[in-house]
Curated annotation (Swiss-Prot):
Residues 833-840 are annotated as: Required for phosphatidylinositol 4,5-bisphosphate-dependent location at the cell membrane. The lineage of its organism: Eukaryota, Metazoa, Chordata, Craniata, Vertebrata. It comes from Homo sapiens. Residues 125-127 are lumenal. Homodimer. Interacts with ESYT1 and ESYT3. Interacts with FGFR1 that has been activated by FGF1 binding. Interacts with the AP-2 complex; identified in a complex with the AP-2 complex and FGFR1. Changing residue 413 to N: Strongly reduces calcium binding. Signal peptide: none annotated. Ca(2+) 2 binds at residues 401, 413, 460-462. It is a peripheral membrane protein; Multi-pass membrane protein. Pfam families: C2, SMP_LBD. This is Extended synaptotagmin-2.
Amino acid sequence: MTANRDAALSSHRHPGCAQRPRTPTFASSSQRRSAFGFDDGNFPGLGERSHAPGSRLGARRRAKTARGLRGHRQRGAGAGLSRPGSARAPSPPRPGGPENPGGVLSVELPGLLAQLARSFALLLPVYALGYLGLSFSWVLLALALLAWCRRSRGLKALRLCRALALLEDEERVVRLGVRACDLPAWVHFPDTERAEWLNKTVKHMWPFICQFIEKLFRETIEPAVRGANTHLSTFSFTKVDVGQQPLRINGVKVYTENVDKRQIILDLQISFVGNCEIDLEIKRYFCRAGVKSIQIHGTMRVILEPLIGDMPLVGALSIFFLRKPLLEINWTGLTNLLDVPGLNGLSDTIILDIISNYLVLPNRITVPLVSEVQIAQLRFPVPKGVLRIHFIEAQDLQGKDTYLKGLVKGKSDPYGIIRVGNQIFQSRVIKENLSPKWNEVYEALVYEHPGQELEIELFDEDPDKDDFLGSLMIDLIEVEKERLLDEWFTLDEVPKGKLHLRLEWLTLMPNASNLDKVLTDIKADKDQANDGLSSALLILYLDSARNLPSGKKISSNPNPVVQMSVGHKAQESKIRYKTNEPVWEENFTFFIHNPKRQDLEVEVRDEQHQCSLGNLKVPLSQLLTSEDMTVSQRFQLSNSGPNSTIKMKIALRVLHLEKRERPPDHQHSAQVKRPSVSKEGRKTSIKSHMSGSPGPGGSNTAPSTPVIGGSDKPGMEEKAQPPEAGPQGLHDLGRSSSSLLASPGHISVKEPTPSIASDISLPIATQELRQRLRQLENGTTLGQSPLGQIQLTIRHSSQRNKLIVVVHACRNLIAFSEDGSDPYVRMYLLPDKRRSGRRKTHVSKKTLNPVFDQSFDFSVSLPEVQRRTLDVAVKNSGGFLSKDKGLLGKVLVALASEELAKGWTQWYDLTEDGTRPQAMT
């Protein structure tokens, strides 16, 4: 009995037990009473009452007594009391070591520093808000941004998990049901093979591919990054793990038609969903960053050429993407900042631009398998042709704008997006019109027409999300066969709508026999303009340079970069670091308006010290008399060292339209049906291709011409009239097609909505300027121009079809702070206040009489510009979150003047709101 009691007491007094002790279970009531130290003799009558059958009162009393005894013993144990004869179990020592004498607590220094750092990070934004005098709305904005960031990262992780699940069990996922747009290419196209044997081969080779990639990162990329900048001297990859999921090939297509007999063309639909871990560190700045997952999807073309009669039967291997692939990256460490909404799309776009500079058509990776002599032609790719797209008009489009929650149907604000491979164009927006007339022309290079299509999509511009109005896809092989297509095409994926296009396939001629005729057709023989319809194509292969002089420091090697320009079109090569004998091996193309009057200007610059290392000017007329209109040699640089040369290969090709006679009942199959794609996916894809700006080497992408003047082709109106077009429509078409409007050509960012920030800040800035003006007056009489003046030159160029505005200078501006002002000029061509229509000068620091001398242009015709107003605002620039930003003055210039074609230069008075339009005086 004593042993049972001690065991029961010790179990209840076990130190460290946080839960309420359970009552020990006994076989009988006598054992239960003995365990608690009493029997029936100590409590007379208890045993008899407890054994009485059906006694509910006895049961309740027994339970109450037992609970009271347990509570009494527990209170005694907590107060240091114990029953006589029972030893109290010693308390075990606390984890973490013995207790400190005198009750002094031990504090870990790293933990304390971490806690202080977290507290500082939390309190610093609060202090900054108070110091900068910002409102509480910034806190709400930060919280919203944080929530958006977490949601974005969660969605990205969810997409990664779905993609991994699809790769692991593709058959089960397909059987459960997926959308048609998510299926691989071999499901949609019968000529695309699944080639599962290739995936099995890649899976077996994947561990060795990972070893090669790790060596590439550690032995090639890491030393290159360290040598690029002294601040990156401690850069290193701490972990390079590409992951266990191999690259997957969803379909393979081999071209057998319209292919040279000495080449093999394959299209691989690749998909990589990798749970990779790539971590990097810059020890000097305690900076850690990395990538934890990557997704990339796209169509990669592999060309085996030339086929030869000797082993290995293939001269070289060329690899490139037909268009920018889809990319998604999950960042870790410091690069988590790139997952912030707004920055995540920008970071992915920058990486895509870097990939495009090496792997997107016309850029390619060429792996020679034989001697350099046989593959020299591969490093100088010549386009198969040039596609001239006349984007004329549309009819019977859907009305997407509604009012009163859909009760009243309105019209649409249509615009078009045209894509040829990696080249994307966007038309201007026609407000509230279901039969818009654009009358715009684009020119695009076509390097690989098998497998490439002309894709056109129409959208209705809205402030929040643009609505889909229809699409069109045209096979470029059929356009090449027809040479000229001028007709109405029915829009796909919508119930109604037609689009009028004129497509011209221009052949590249290696002689100048047809040049005079081409110049006459495009009206380039009557002016010296540098833009307009193109008559020729300039192809330039930049090879290398030798014996370049040093920069400003004689002992250091320069970082050479080459800038090339023809007229107002300029392109730039990649930067080669720390060398005076750089090797570029890059290709560039320029559309030429009139080769008889235009020159190629080349300048080699030191990017580090921003100085010129030499320049060169090549008249294009020299190429007209050269053999095959091609020159390949080393050119002597001017204003450079005595032996400084640059090696280039330059070729000129005349753009010739070969017209073919067709019977009246001739049919073609140019329009093709696109695979079923969700509208949401389509819009996302287009945005991903149009977002971002080219990087430093982004000019290598095949350039496109701006929208330019049209042509007066005989019979164009009669051939292109739709069934329901009337005489008035034909008259309008003939009138509008004779003067095609100009607008930006190759675009990279689609920003249709107005600049909201400017609209919101305008009333506030005007009010602040009026208060500042009253403070300046303060009982004194101000002059005629209290806010100062601005000098502008305004004219309209009929040759370029553009409004040209030259901002010369400002004088007598007001001081925005004690140090003066940091003025710059912002312009809009009202009523267009979109961000893409904004023009800005550079900022002049700490001056009240800045000199800008900068020229800007707006693509608009003369009749239209005379109905518009030029909005010019002089503003003060400040740093990020600075209080010194504000308006210095405005002026509105009415352009309804007959002298606009001649132009004028004038000083304009600045006012606080610019509400008084000023015309030419």
